[in-house]
């Protein structure tokens, strides 16, 4: 009997092993199929600290990024939006994320997702909430999980955004927006960067605010000065002494600038300048520090260089918005290109890996080029994306109002920002929106061709991220330009306008 029991037990054990092996094989096959059909491309987590860093920047430019793209790269996450005359971008580096992981050996091509989606807001609304709401129900973490589509007939990747607040968790799912548009992202390789101190930032914004709404501004940089003047009225201007630095430092300090000034040093009996004393002497000497961009030689830039911005108020708003937290006042960045650009950039002062820029293209150059047919630059061909239909996103777009801007009626919103011609963003159904520019890592800013409307090939599918165009409607056509003062006697006192 004992022999019979042992035989039965042995047989049962063999069947159990076979069953376990079959189950394990099935699990392995299922896991393999899941990996093949839904492999993880990105898995990154923005923690509470990262949200607190990014929120003020994105909140400041909320009305610009409502129709933007979220660009997932191997080195950062970028929020990007382009118009025909300029662009805005916010670059979130990996160092502000709590966790980041991406599929090794994957394609280096960036993945694009439309920010302007679901019915109850847009993709990044959790970073653009008012401070009061954030304090009442703070965001604890936001997980960006990008996987390959589990549909074998669907080639686009899926983004699952999981936002965890103290009150609970919400999830948004978005398909990649492969479009026929091109995206351009500027790099740190600019022609030069002007580090504005608080005194010059305040003086410039006050001067811009006193100009008529439809006034244009020419911003110029030379070997000796940074100047801003009203277009068509050279007597109405403000200028500062430009002090070129030998090297571009990661962090610009007042003492670095003062060390370059002849005869300026610490007070008697003191080893170094106090911050208060340094700023006072900077203001007395009307000095701003200018750093040559990497790869550029100061003597070979062909100064003076200038950029004509059509909307003084747009430039003023950009300077005000990007004066944020630990970064202090933003920098003015000149780009050297066929169409010279001027950027208001939040960078180089804070220690965190977060960059923001509102960039304006030279209006005079753009006007000269609008009547010409451009050939696409050769260096743009590598970043082409095929157009695919994204009807699910197009349907979701219909919920937005006529203004096409979330929060446009708020006090701090920006109806005229970013568009150099002082425009507002409106949506017109059935119209294609202006194409963006090319995503490239070169030192050269975009060419005008990347911001011109292009005819869609016959039979090509519409893009999902912007089937309805964000058209530019000039809100200052009927206003008359204020007359230029005939002499300096008619102008405001020099202490309000700055020394000429």
From Swiss-Prot:
It comes from the Viruses. One of its GO terms (cellular component) is host cell nucleus. The keyword Transferase does not apply. GO terms for molecular function: DNA binding. It is found in: Host nucleus. Its main location: host cell. Residues 388-500 are annotated as: Disordered. Belongs to the herpesviridae DNA polymerase processivity factor family. Plays an essential role in viral DNA replication by acting as the polymerase accessory subunit. Associates with the viral polymerase to increase its processivity and forms high-affinity direct interactions with DNA. Facilitates the origin-binding protein UL9 loading onto DNA thus increasing its ability to assemble into a functional complex capable of unwinding duplex DNA. This is DNA polymerase processivity factor. It comes from Psittacid herpesvirus 1 (isolate Amazon parrot/-/97-0001/1997).
């Amino acid at each position: 009997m004992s022999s019979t029991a042992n035989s039965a037990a042995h047989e049962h054990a063999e069947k159990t092993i076979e069953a376990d092996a079959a189950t394990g094989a099935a699990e392995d096959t299922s896991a393999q199929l899941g990996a093949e059909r839904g492999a993880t491309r990105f898995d990154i987590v923005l923690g509470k600290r990262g949200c607190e860093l990014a929120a003020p920047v994105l909140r400041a430019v909320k009305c610009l990024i409502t129709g933007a793209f979220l660009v997932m790269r191997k080195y950062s996450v970028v929020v990007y939006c382009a118009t025909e005359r300029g662009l805005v971008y916010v670059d979130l580096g990996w160092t502000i994320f709590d966790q980041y992981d991406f599929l090794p050996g994957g394609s280096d091509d960036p993945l694009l997702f439309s920010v302007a989606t679901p019915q109850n807001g847009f993709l990044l609304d959790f970073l653009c909430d008012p401070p009061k709401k954030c304090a009442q129900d703070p965001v604890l973490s936001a997980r960006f999980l990008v996987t390959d589509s589990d549909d074998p007939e669907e080639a686009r990747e899926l983004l699952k955004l999981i936002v965890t607040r103290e009150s609970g968790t919400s999830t948004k799912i978005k398909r990649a927006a492969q479009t026929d548009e091109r995206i351009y992202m500027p790099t740190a390789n600019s022609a030069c960067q002007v580090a504005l101190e608080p005194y010059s930032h305040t003086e410039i914004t006050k001067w811009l605010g006193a100009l008529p709404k439809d006034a244009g501004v020419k911003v110029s940089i030379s070997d000796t000065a940074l100047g801003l003047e009203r277009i068509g009225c050279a007597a109405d201007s403000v200028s500062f002494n430009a002090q070129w630095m030998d090297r571009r430092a990661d962090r610009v300090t007042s003492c670095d600038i003062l060390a370059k000034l002849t005869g300026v040093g610490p007070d008697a009996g003191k080893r170094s300048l106090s911050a208060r004393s340094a700023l006072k002497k900077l203001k007395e000497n009307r000095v701003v520090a200018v750093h040559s961009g990497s790869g550029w030689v100061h003597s070979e830039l062909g100064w003076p260089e200038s950029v004509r911005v059509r909307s003084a108020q747009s430039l003023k708003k950009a300077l005000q918005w990007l004066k944020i937290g630990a970064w202090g006042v933003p920098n003015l960045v000149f780009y050297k290109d066929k169409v010279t650009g001027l950027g208001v950039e939040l960078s180089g002062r804070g220690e965190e890996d977060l960059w923001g820029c509102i960039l304006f293209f030279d209006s005079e150059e753009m006007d000269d080029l609008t009547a010409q047919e451009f050939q696409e630059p050769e260096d743009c061909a590598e970043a082409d994306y095929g157009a695919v239909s994204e009807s699910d996103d197009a349907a979701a777009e219909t919920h937005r109002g006529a203004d096409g801007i979330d929060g446009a009626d708020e006090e701090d919103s920006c109806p005229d920002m970013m568009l150099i011609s002082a425009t507002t963003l409106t949506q017109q159904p059935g119209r294609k929106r202006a194409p963006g520019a090319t995503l490239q890592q070169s030192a050269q800013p975009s060419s005008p061709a990347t911001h011109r409307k292009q005819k869609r090939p016959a039979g090509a599918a519409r893009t999902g991220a912007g089937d309805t165009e964000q058209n530019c409607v000039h809100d200052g056509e009927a206003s008359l330009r204020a007359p230029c003062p005939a002499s300096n006697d008619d102008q405001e006192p020099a202490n309000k306008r700055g020394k000429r």
